[in-house]
Amino acid sequence: MKQNILFYLIALLFFPLYEMQAAHQPEFSTAGFYELANSGREVYSMNPAWRFHKGAATGAEATDFNDRNWKMVSLPDGIEYVPTEASGCINYQGEVWYRKHFTPADELKGKKLFLHFEAIMGKSKVFVNGNLLTEHFGGYLPVVVDVTDALNWETDNVIAVWADNSNDPSYPPCKAQDVLDYTYFGGIYRDCWLIAHRPVFITDPNFENEMAGGGLFVSYDKVSDTSAEIILKAHIRNDSKKNFKGVVEYELQQPDGTQAAFLNDVIQVRPGKAVTSKDKIMLKSPLLWSPETPTLYNLIVRIRDNEGNVVDGYRRRIGIRSVEFKGKDGFWLNGKPYPSPLIGANRHQDFAVVGNAVANSIHWRDAKKLRDAGMKVIRNAHCPQDPAFMDACDELGLFVIVNTPGWQFWNDAPEFAQRVYSDIRNLVRRDRNHPCVWLWEPILNETWYPADFAQNTLDIVNQEYPYPYCYSGCDSEARGHEVYPVLFTHPANADKDWAIKSLDPKITYFTREWGDNVDDWNSHNSPSRVARNWGEQAMLIQAQHYAAPRYPFTCYDVLCRTPRQHVGGCLWHSFDHQRGYHPDPFYGGVMDVFRQPKYAYYMFKAQRSPEKQDRLFETGPMVHIAHEMTPFSPKDVTVYSNCDEVRLTYNKGGKTWTYTKPATKEGMPSPVITFKDIYDFMIDKNMSMRKKKQDEVFLLAEGIIDGKVVATHEVRPARRPEKLLLWVDNENTDLKADGSDFVTVVAAIADKNGNIKRLNNYYVKFHVEGEGRILGGANILANPAPVKWGTAPVLIQSTLKPGKIKITASVLFEGSQMPASAVLELESKPAAHPFIYTESEAALIPMSSDSPFGQSAAKSASELEQERLLKERNAQRLKEVEKQQADFGEKK
């Protein structure tokens, strides 16, 4: 381990901090905190280099078990890579084993050492050096293990994890995957950390199992623009053999580092005991958190002994806000009525190829893309999601409905309910300090549970969060819903068969899922369920269905017309995702499994405010033409924009049309704009072939506010496919060299001017050189990858070494007249935390896919230049062919 820590420090010297911060770089918590320098608390990534076996393996917990033939993986790991169409239970369910070899560094001696698995799917057992240290049931919450006395020094240690994602009715969610509307996937699919600190320390709330306690608990009261009370609790344990006397310090810093408050609390902790420090900050003129201004303070907590030495400490990002649900008066934020319905979407975290084994950066990018689209609330479907996603929502201003795991299943066995109750307690303990938490949803999704269960779950949330601004929601159809302050239902101004029949003035209402519209719950045909590659017509219908269909239905427009008592709704669903009980994925996302946008995404974007602000997410005016100018494109041209006016121009010197937004304040902020009977392919043909004015054919939309053009979007017909384009979809975030992080690189088929050719059926093969690897191979159609709606994405993962990565993309079957290859170079940056692994083990991590068909040779600069010159020569030769075809073709 020593040499790996040294490499980490050397890397920081070669990649200075200022280079890493050219753009905003998100940071992610570890076990609920952010590391604080010189605190005596260190965080090590345990993600690299685990040996993996799919299936049963008798005796695999033993230190001397022979695992030399096992596959080498790094965490997060989802057991297997899957195709983009991975529904219908094609994924593996069953036992798996992981084994990690390492030798702990001497500097860890004498410290408390905790293994923190953010989640392990299914039921699991954790062994260290052959000893069973813990057993866990459930796949979405932390598994924390005290390994202080389990390690051996100056020799090889083995952590062995057994996990099983098989159908099991004894713990939630419990529903068998073949009758489940999502997919469990499997493995150790989130991060694993080793937390090291001194024997006097701030505890982990998910390890301590103390009601409304353990760790750090930050809550608020009397929040307003002028002042706020910040209620502080810190649970301190003394595992040393001496009495401890000292202080707990709380330092509150504004985002710019300015100290906003400081106080301390004297503590005394006897050996083997724990105490809770309680204090309160009275803050004047607080910078309040909201979706529009998600201001985060840094709360630094330190334990000092009587000599002033720092014994333990860490940093926590907090947002000061109040949330109140006031029945007929609706939702109030920070002491004021919130001015509009909160509209957002549900989110499963699964991603193309990797399933649920998603890198932290992807969680941040997901949140960023949703916030860019103007969404303000996300419902975690149907489980606590990765801590990295919660961190991102804090930073980007997304409210979150936090769900306990559960979906249409109840088991009368007492152990089942107890495990549900345990999950609720642990999700509150894990997420209680996040300002993004809007509602707790402790009931089981769409489940016929006993009536007393609803009361019990509400009581548990209130026990675990006994402070102001804590609210829970429940389905209006569920047994026992009467005790809940927030009920989920459809609004009365939509489909009246779905809406609640009478409103209680004391209750606040919200639509937890809207937008899906199946013909029946077996076929699952719906105008909302549209694969991106089905093209313009299908995507236009989906976007209109979500915006304002011509039939009674809960849609964006309807939700904007509700009384204050109905406070918004979450679309089902943000992204396409995999399912167990149906052969088709859910295609109803506004983005696909790679997070490539459909037209509906831009419809959502058009609903955000046109006011430009300095934020981490996109703000300001926008305009988007939902039309590709193909021979099959509709005559009507659809545009999405949040501007007051939109001017559409068809061709250079051609006609223009102007749309003016209605003055009414009712309904969705920006209705879908349709310019009727505009596009004509024959006009394109006439301009292009007969008049030789291809460059003058286009659609141009200009967004206008106060008479000024503030946003534009131009679309041109894609001509002959000439080349590939490559770009990285990273939201300007760095690729971290931690062996786990990955980024989406997109190849597109384009004409000579870079216009994407949406209609083609090529395959693209990728080759990577340097410090990166491709995730997935030909066996799952990841590499080579089919081109869908003009693009073929691939996932590029970092290695453990920062450095350059070169990606080459070519069409699978190359020829002198096929599109030219493209090259893209990336550079991975140093990881945020040092690693623990054995060098010889890490060297066995595969650098390429195990599918030989997916391997393409790298192209040298000279080969690429030859390709370019050949394309130029061919273009000249083709001009003669084109002329002769024109001479013998139609003249009129």
Feature annotation, model-predicted:
Residues 232-236, 302, 637-641, 727, ...:
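Beta-strand-rich structural segments
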Residues 41-64, 80, 120, 180, ...:
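Substrate-binding clefts and catalytic carboxylate motifs of secreted carbohydrate-active enzymes
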Residues 147, 278-288, 672-694, 783-800:
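Short, hydrophobic beta-strand segments
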Residues 77-104, 108-129, 134-137, 168, ...:
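Active-site-adjacent substrate/metal-binding segments within catalytic domains
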Residues 364-369, 377-600, 621-626:
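Substrate-binding/catalytic cleft of secreted carbohydrate-active enzymes
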Residues 108-111, 151-156, 243, 283-296, ...:
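Short glycine/proline/serine/threonine-rich loop/turn segments at secondary-structure transition edges
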Residues 28, 32-36, 56, 93-209, ...:
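Accessory beta-strand-rich segments of carbohydrate-active enzymes
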Residues 152-156, 233-326, 824-826:
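Extended acidic/polar, glycine-enriched regions
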